[in-house]
Amino acid sequence: MESQTKFDYESLAFTKLSHSQWTDYFLSVPIDDSELDAITREIDIIKPEVRKLLSSKGDDETSKRKVLLIQSLLSLGLAFHFENEIKDILEDAFRRIDDITGDENDLSTISIMFRVFRTYGHNLPSSVFKRFTGDDGKFERSLTEDAKGILSLYEAAHLGTTTDYILDEALEFTSSHLKSLLVGGMCRPHILRLIRNTLYLPQRWNMEAVIAREYISFYEQEEDHDKMLLRLAKLNFKLLQLHYIKELKTFIKWWMELGLTSKWPSQFRERIVEAWLAGLMMYFEPQFSGGRVIAAKFNYLLTILDDACDHYFSIPELTRLVDCVERWNHDGIHTLEDISRIIFKLALDVFDDIGRGVRSKGCSYYLKEMLEELKILVRANLDLVKWARGNQLPSFEEHVEVGGIALTTYATLMYSFVGMGEAVGKEAYEWVRSRPRLIKSLAAKGRLMDDITDFESDMSNGFAANAINYYMKQFVVTKEEAILECQKMVVDINKIVNEELLKTTTVPRRVLKQALNFGRLLEVLYTKSDDIYNCSEGKLKEYIVTLLIDPIHL
């Protein structure tokens, strides 16, 4: 029987996580503001030259070349510099799409055009790929001689919706051939490296900063690369690296001033650089530098709160904390136990700290909406804990819905809007509060991916609130069958997400992109069933080194 004052967390087989190894390193990295200014000036000199390439007049072939250029800009991390030009080009080209694509028989070109138009919300039909299939509906075997074309088709297949059956065939066809290319080593090394990276995570679901860093290395090895474009991409990424390190310094100093490390139980994770990295997955552009610091603070708070709910609080303790958060009254802090009091004080401090900035811009509404989502989040966590430790057995569907809230789906989108300031309006918050199908699908995806990854550890820790566990019980299947079915659900959800991104035409593209970026965050964190947020080695270390430590040579 659980104690009414303290949950026996010491009885859990919970493995203590190491604290972040990166904080001291990034505090010691020097930043030269004069270098940052010099890079910015050179970028401003080159950008008009690229803009000329985008604004040139011409025929259908010219429009086609522009679309291919847009894909290069996306892959190199440069598209945000030219959003207005890209919008105009694609709107004009889509009106003439049949003329532009009609006689085109190059697999790579059609695949790239498909990706670009769908990325920007233009629903180019997947029937454009029928020209590459035989009478049996299968893709022609002769296509396998075109490695870049196959790779482009593989990327395009990840933008499929629930009715794009030809893209299901394309994914099966391309993935098997790309794996054969890796084994056979028949391509040049830089192409094989790109194939390996893409098979791990396609661009559709990878974080933009990683895409840019990897593609710059690939593009430089291409014999026909544009030297001006390559120079701009390198300068841009170097500028991003400088911004990122400055942000980390700001966040790490804030965390150190809190002085909370010695007060936390050993079960709590202090994932400092990791909390910032999760914010980077939501937006990588330099204009959202302040937003990433805001995101890091929220992520730190949410990580501590998650650990307290899962591994420390008794149900009565958590109930009192939830009540206190819902009242949001400073006086209520005196009703809480020690750790609860520290966490609630941290929440108050985070909101006060961020509130000073948004109120100065007349954006206090944004913080109010974020607070409302925090209240919903802590209530959902309480429900999960009651299910995990009590005798209640929710349905699989109920767990996925409530667990999607507890996973911070809605809260993460809200704090990303707060960090964007006036770049998004009230309609963005109202849209998320309406719980549209797109966001509910992402919440379900996150819950499923997290529970697939954590199933073994949840069970060994005695934490029953897991989708795999509930699916096994509800449908009387084995663990392996439950995992397979949940993995299929994730694949189907990705198609629904793609579909909703195309169908949702009343919401600004920047807001929709935040939803897509949350989907990317989930893929980065949980692909290959490897929870990189809680593992300081492996893929997480690779990302940190690639994005922040390895210099990009100008």
Swiss-Prot record:
What Gene3D superfamilies would the database entry show? Farnesyl Diphosphate Synthase, Terpene synthase, N-terminal domain
Per UniProt, subcellular location reads as:
Cytoplasm
Its catalytic activity?
Answer: (2E,6E)-farnesyl diphosphate = (Z)-gamma-bisabolene + diphosphate
Instruction: List positions binding Mg(2+) 3.
Output: 450, 458
Entry binding sites for Mg(2+) 2 = 306, 310
What does the record give as cofactor? Answer: Mg(2+); Mn(2+)
Residues noted as binding Mg(2+) 1 in the record, renumbered to the chain = 306, 310
InterPro entries with a match to the protein in the record: Isoprenoid_synthase_dom_sf (IPR008949), Terpene_cyclase_plant_C1 (IPR044814), Terpene_synth_N (IPR001906), Terpene_synth_N_sf (IPR036965), Terpene_synthase-like (IPR050148), Terpene_synthase_metal-bd (IPR005630), Terpenoid_cyclase/PrenylTrfase (IPR008930)
Assigned keywords, A-Z: Cytoplasm, Lyase, Magnesium, Manganese, Metal-binding
Q: What is known of its domains?
A: The Asp-Asp-Xaa-Xaa-Asp/Glu (DDXXD/E) motif is important for the catalytic activity, presumably through binding to Mg(2+).
Say which family it is in. Answer: Belongs to the terpene synthase family. Tpsa subfamily.
Q: What is this protein called?
A: (Z)-gamma-bisabolene synthase 2
